[in-house]
Amino acid sequence: YEFKGIVCTDWGITQDPEKTIEGFGSRCYGVQDMTEAERCLLAITNGVDQFGGNSESGPIVEAYKIGCEKYGEKAMRERMELSAKRLLINIFHCGLFEDPYLDPEESAKIVGCEEFCRHGYEAQQKSIVLLKNSAKRAPEGQKGVLPLKKGLKVYIPERKIGPSKAFFRIDLPAKTEDPLPDGLPSKYGTRVASPEEADVALVFIESPACNPYSTKDLANGGNGYLPITLQYRPYTAKKAREVSIAGGDFRENFTNRSYLGKTNTAYNEADLDNILECRRAMGDKPVIVCATVNNPMVMHEFEAEADAIVAEFGVSRAAVLDVVFGGYNPTGRLPIQMPKDMDAVEEQSEDRALDMETYIDSEGHNYDYGYGMNYEGVLPAWKK
């Protein structure tokens, strides 16, 4: 295709594989019987210029030697110099050889400058989606409970998170965390220690997260695979596939990874408890839910208990508080569908977009792709 740029691999694809499927370190799938140098040579001869995350030169040097024996030194040198040329061209284009030094004063004017930070913060605000804004406990003169008036007494419960796994399957202990460790800015109101003292509860949650693999299940004769749950309470997969689509890892003696009939629970299940407990304790006072959405989530477990729901996708707390307290009238729309329930998740087609039965809340709003609200009501439908 006459591509003249750099081909860089994903991270960790040439090293020897982990001994068990539980590990998620090196991933040399399909070439696990080769040496690391042989894997590198295979990649190089197929057009790879750079190995992501690899700082060891030894296997590359060994790959060159093997290549010289196999293809001849002239051919291997030409191939290595081609990658060197591609890599160096980008550096030349940046002028880093001609002028490798930075002017600290000039850098200070550019990096983190007011203009760039303003644009970044505005992008955060624009991405926030107001899913629900009930009029039931709205102040006089407002169509919904949001924006909150400033100067209120606000209760914000701590989050309790159970034991979990990090990205590389490292064990993480249970923890308790304050969702606003720097405190509630005084311009918004006063944070209080109990729902009884508060005018409003502000509950920060994250979408349900779980561990989809169990060594205990494997030891007990299962295949180790558990359902990925998008709800907080225990989920039993009654409508999952009997036979999985994928399977056949060289470290497993089976190909069916089905989790049909198995149960899993979100390790942040206590997020749901916080909402329900606040609803009971607050009585007729409003409960506002602010959800960090890392993946689609089942809303029916708590939606009816919340007066307002604000969804964000990894922005600063300051941007969220702007929406809650009237500093920014939300404009964001859902970039995903929120499923009606876990059956809808299991029944959707993995390779088809926007085919899921979506959740309709207690106000009659459909949490479909493109849905969102502002303080006045539901945003107008997108023009196709």
Show the residue positions of the predicted features.
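An alpha-helix initiation/capping motif
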Residues: 81, 85, 114-121
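Flexible hinge/switch segments at interdomain interfaces of large molecular machines
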Residues: 95-105, 203-206
